Every structure is written in structure tokens, then in C-alpha cells.
């Protein structure tokens, strides 16, 4: 029976589940728990409710599963700016060592490293060299009665590397003259390089308020091919090209020009139209980025290039007990012998076989610069004579050594590329709430009603248990009292008529 008999009055009352079903906002259950016997209508309503509940659980589990797959979407936008910070520009001559600056002591210590001499300090293939160069090299490589002096790789690179003051023919930024003093010396795998707008030494970062040519950096360089080292052997540092390597990067990112730079050839004016990109990536579990504020051992700001340099430095120091000149830290610089026998092979091994040693994640915030390059030939036939007179160089020399580099913003805007969470908690709750409303007509308040019903049900059961314990204790006490009273059943000769509606408490008193 769905109706239960009241213990106090003997009347029929609805059960607690029936009361809840008829007062709850949960759809359908009032038709299941109705007063009366089981009917087909109640069964159909029960099937419909259970089916809807099953569909709700299936759809909700799918939404929860999608949330925990941590998907992301990418938002691309273009923002117009009033002004933009001009990027740092690092440039290196592809020839790291000026031949005329080499000394006998340099060749004694580093001749094999430069592939100019063999292990016996002899010129390996003299027939490949230009006679003039060969004669100069023979004079410098004459070690008869020579007493070697101390040798420092840092001093060697600083002295022998190309000097920007000699290379630069003119420099302009936004139409205003600039010079070698506006560049900072940095060391890379190419040796002595120069960075424009580095922001170091307390110098303010340069900005630009216009896009297009004439509103950026324009420099004319002489790459000095006459100073290039003769090549008759190959090492890790050997290059067969002539020109400069250039990298455009943010000031917080160290140059990694050997992998990220682009080449600029002599005999051409190269136009580089760039656009700033600001990228935002998500951390785990939505992405794989690492916070830029989490610095490294040798760099305060995290970036992929900083991570690579940091990792290579630690690897070389661990394996060779020294560091290359372009590497940060306080370990001693590698000698030429350590360079050739340990450092260079170790870097090659790191790149080829031990790539898992340097796993550098993308920073969560990154600034990079897209580039579009175009070139025109210089000098033109009409300007050749003028340039010959201006620089006191032949047309052949100008064509083989002079280049012009023009770097500018394509437009005064920047592009934002941002990863966003495809599915957040608010969307998950909204979807589940919508499914609940669709299938069972429930809401958050309905769930609160369920919890309230469960609470009242538990409270009622606990009170019933406590009431029964008190009733049993009272009954035992009454039984002991009745045993001490005299038995009057023999003296009572008439029948007591007790109405059927008399309360149980009165009957107990009469019975006692």
C-alpha cells in the first residue's frame, strides 16, 4: 500500500516519499508516487523518468569528459598602436676572425682550431691559398725560436673580430644619424657581434610612431671580404658564405643568431618589413607553456633561446669544465684545445643524440617579429662612379663587400595570438544545468530540495530510534511499578466500557 496507517489515530497518511514527490519541483515523480495502487500509468511515468535520468547522465558525463580533455582555441586579433618599441637587431659578420689581426701567438694556440694549421702547426694545403695570403700566413706561422705567450679566447675574439666602427659606412634611425656607439657588443657562435637598441647600460628603448621605409633602422656595411680567413679545411665554425647574419628579436631575449638569423648578401640593399606578434600560450593542462617569470640559472627572463643557451652552457661545463665565450656564467673559458677536443664535439653530440637533455617549453608570453624580405641590386650603373669616389673603392669591391640593410615596421600595429580555454567551468555548469532542465526539469534549487529531503528523512529515522529507546526504558519502569500495586481484578465485578477512540495512553493507565 502507498498509504500508511497512522499509529496515533488509526487513519491513513501518505508516506514521506509521496509527500516529497507531490511538493518537489522535480518533473514527473509526482505521477510515479501517487496515492493508490500500482497502475500502468505509474509504470509508464517511471520508465519515462528513468530514461530521462539516464540520458541526463550520459550527456553530462560527455560534457565532463570534454572538460577534462582540456581543449583550447586560438584567438587572432590585430591591434592599432600609437607607437611601438623598435626591436633589438643583432648582426654578425659571417667571418668571425680578421686575417690581418692574427698574430704568431694566435696561430700557435688557435691555428688548428681555425683550420689554418694542422696538428703539427704546418700549413696543410698551401696550393689552395692565394699567394699573397699564403706568404703572410707563412710569416705569421714561423715558430722557429718562438716562445709562446699566454692566450685568452675572450681577448682573442674581441681583438680579432670585425670592428663595427670599420664596417659601418653610415647609419640612420628614423632619418636621424646614428653610429657604432649606438650598438652593444655581444658574443655569439659567430664570434663578436653587435646589437642595436639593446636597452642595456641604462639606455632607453627606441620607439617609432610610423611604419614604412625611412622610419626604422638603415645601415650600410662593408663586410671586408679581404679579411676573411682562407679556407682549405672544414671545422664546426667554417662558413663558405660572405655577408652578415641578422636576427630581429625582443630585448628580453638573448640572440640565437646561428639558428634564428637570416642572411644579408653584399651587393644588395635588403628591405626587411616586420610586424610585431604578441603570443599568449596556456599552461598545463591546457597547453605546454612555461611562465616567463620563471627565470633560469643565467637569465632572469625565460625564453626558448635563453633556455637553449642555458642548457648548452650547463652541458659544456659538466662535460668539459669550461665554457665558450658566448656562454654566460663564471666558469673559465675553454682553451683552443678544449674547444676542438671537447666543447665542439659535445655540442654536436647534444644536438644529434642527446636532444632530450635540452627540452625547452614555449614561454606563456612571447614577442616575436614576422619578416618579409626583398632586395635590390647595388650599385646601379649610374651610381657606381659616385660610390667609387665617395668610399674610395672600386665598383668590383663595392659589389662584393657593400650592403645596405633597411629594417622597418610594415604598419603601426601588432598582432595578438592568444590561446584560450575552449571549455571553462561556467560553460560546463551551464551545459549540465541545461541538460537537467531539458530531461528532468531540475535546477540547483531542485538539488537542494533533494538534500533537504534526505536530511529530514535521516533526522526522522534518528528521532524514531531515540524515541523507541526512551519508550522501552519507560515501559520497563512502568512494569516494575505495576508489580508493586495490589491486584484488584478479583474485586471488580463489572466491565469497563472503553471507547474505541480512546487514546493509547489512557488504555495503558487502565491496564496498569
UniProtKB/Swiss-Prot annotation:
Can you quote a single GO CC term?
dendritic spine
Q: Kindly report every residue range on the membrane side named Cytoplasmic.
A: 1-37, 449-512
- One Gene Ontology term from the biological process aspect of the record: monoatomic cation transport
Which regions span the lipid bilayer? 38-58, 428-448
On tissue specificity, the annotation reads: Expressed by sensory neurons. Expressed by nociceptive sensory neurons, spiral ganglion (SG) neurons and the retina (at protein level). Expressed in outer nuclear layer of retina (photoreceptors) and to a lower extent in distal and proximal inner nuclear layer.
Enzymatic reactions? Na(+)(in) = Na(+)(out); K(+)(in) = K(+)(out); Li(+)(in) = Li(+)(out)
When the coding gene is removed by deletion, what phenotypic consequences does the entry describe? Mice lacking Asic2 display reduced sensitivity of a specific component of mechanosensation. They develop hypertension, exaggerated sympathetic and depressed parasympathetic control of the circulation, and a decreased gain of the baroreflex. They also display altered rod phototransduction and neurotransmission, associated with increased light-induced retina damages. Despite a normal hearing sensitivity, susceptibility to noise-induced temporary threshold shifts is decreased.
How does its activity get regulated?
A: Inhibited by the diuretic drug amiloride.
Where is the protein localized?
Cell membrane
**Location (main, coarse):** membrane
What residues bear Phosphoserine in this entry?
8, 11
Which residues form each disulfide bond in the chain?
Answer: 92-193, 289-364, 307-360, 311-358, 320-342, 322-334
Subunit and interaction comment: Can form homotrimers. Heterotrimer; forms functional heterotrimers producing channel with different properties. Forms heterotrimers with ASIC1; while ASIC1 determines current amplitude, ASIC2 influences the properties of the current. Forms heterotrimers with ASIC3; resulting in channels with distinct properties. Interacts with STOM; STOM regulates the gating of ASIC2-containing channels. Interacts with PICK1; promotes ASIC3 phosphorylation by PKC and activation of ASIC2/ASIC3 heterotrimers.
**Role according to the record:** Forms pH-gated trimeric sodium channels that act as postsynaptic excitatory sensors in the nervous system. Upon extracellular acidification, these channels generate rapid, transient inward currents that fully desensitize. Highly selective for sodium, they are permeable to other cations. By forming heterotrimeric channels with ASIC1, could contribute to synaptic plasticity, learning, and memory. Additionally, as acid sensors at nerve terminals, plays a role in mechanosensation and phototransduction.
Protein name in the entry: Acid-sensing ion channel 2
Amino acid at each position: 500500500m502507498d498509504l500508511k496507517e497512522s499509529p496515533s489515530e488509526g487513519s491513513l497518511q501518505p508516506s514521506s516519499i509521496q509527500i516529497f514527490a507531490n511538493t518537489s519541483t522535480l518533473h514527473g515523480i509526482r505521477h510515479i508516487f501517487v496515492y493508490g495502487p500500482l497502475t500502468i500509468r505509474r509504470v509508464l511515468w517511471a520508465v519515462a523518468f528513468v530514461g530521462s535520468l539516464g540520458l541526463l547522465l550520459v550527456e553530462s558525463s560527455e560534457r565532463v569528459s570534454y572538460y577534462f580533455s582540456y581543449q583550447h582555441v586560438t584567438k587572432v586579433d590585430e591591434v592599432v598602436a600609437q607607437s611601438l618599441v623598435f626591436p633589438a637587431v643583432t648582426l654578425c659578420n659571417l667571418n668571425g676572425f680578421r686575417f690581418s689581426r692574427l698574430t704568431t701567438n694566435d696561430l700557435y694556440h688557435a691555428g688548428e682550431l681555425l683550420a689554418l694549421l694542422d696538428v703539427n702547426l704546418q700549413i696543410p694545403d698551401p696550393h689552395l691559398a692565394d699567394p699573397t695570403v699564403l706568404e703572410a700566413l707563412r710569416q705569421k706561422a714561423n715558430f722557429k725560436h718562438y716562445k709562446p705567450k699566454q692566450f685568452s679566447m675572450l681577448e682573442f675574439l674581441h681583438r680579432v673580430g670585425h670592428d663595427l666602427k670599420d664596417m659601418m659606412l653610415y647609419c640612420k634611425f628614423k632619418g636621424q644619424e646614428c653610429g657604432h656607439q649606438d650598438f652593444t657588443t655581444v658574443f655569439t657562435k659567430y664570434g663578436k657581434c653587435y646589437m642595436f637598441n639593446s636597452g642595456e647600460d641604462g639606455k632607453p628603448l627606441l620607439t617609432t610612431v610610423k611604419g614604412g621605409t625611412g622610419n626604422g633602422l638603415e645601415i650600410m656595411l662593408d663586410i671586408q671580404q679581404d679579411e676573411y680567413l682562407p679556407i682549405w679545411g672544414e671545422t664546426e665554425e667554417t662558413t663558405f658564405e660572405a655577408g652578415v647574419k641578422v636576427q630581429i628579436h625582443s630585448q628580453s631575449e638573448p640572440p640565437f643568431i646561428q639558428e634564428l638569423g637570416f642572411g644579408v648578401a653584399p651587393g644588395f640593399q635588403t628591405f626587411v618589413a616586420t610586424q610585431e606578434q604578441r603570443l599568449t600560450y596556456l599552461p598545463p593542462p591546457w597547453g605546454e607553456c612555461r611562465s616567463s617569470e620563471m627565470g633560469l640559472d643565467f637569465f632572469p627572463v625565460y625564453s626558448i633561446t635563453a633556455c637553449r643557451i642555458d642548457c648548452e652552457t650547463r652541458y659544456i661545463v659538466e662535460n668539459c669544465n669550461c665554457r665558450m665565450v658566448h656562454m654566460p656564467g663564471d666558469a673559465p673559458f675553454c682553451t683552443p684545445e678544449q674547444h676542438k677536443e671537447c666543447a665542439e664535439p659535445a655540442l654536436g653530440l647534444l644536438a644529434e643524440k642527446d636532444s632530450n637533455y635540452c627540452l625547452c617549453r614555449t614561454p606563456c608570453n612571447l614577442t616575436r617579429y614576422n619578416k618579409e624580405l626583398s632586395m635590390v641590386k647595388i650599385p646601379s650603373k649610374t651610381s657606381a662612379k659616385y660610390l667609387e669616389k665617395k668610399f674610395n673603392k672600386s665598383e668590383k669591391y663595392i659589389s662584393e663587400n657593400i650592403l645596405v640593410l633597411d629594417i622597418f615596421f610594415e604598419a603601426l600595429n601588432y598582432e595578438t595570438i592568444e590561446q584560450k580555454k575552449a571549455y571553462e567551468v561556467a560553460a560546463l555548469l551551464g551545459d549540465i544545468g541545461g541538460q537537467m532542465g531539458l530531461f528532468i526539469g531540475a535546477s540547483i534549487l531542485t538539488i537542494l530540495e533533494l538534500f533537504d529531503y534526505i536530511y529530514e528523512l535521516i533526522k526522522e529515522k534518528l528521532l524514531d530510534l531515540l524515541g523507541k529507546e526512551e519508550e522501552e526504558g519507560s515501559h520497563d519502569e512502568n512494569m516494575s511499578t505495576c508489580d508493586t500495586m495490589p491486584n484488584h481484578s478479583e474485586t471488580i465485578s463489572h466491565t469497563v466500557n472503553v471507547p474505541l477512540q480512546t487514546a493509547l495512553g489512557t488504555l495503558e493507565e487502565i491496564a496498569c
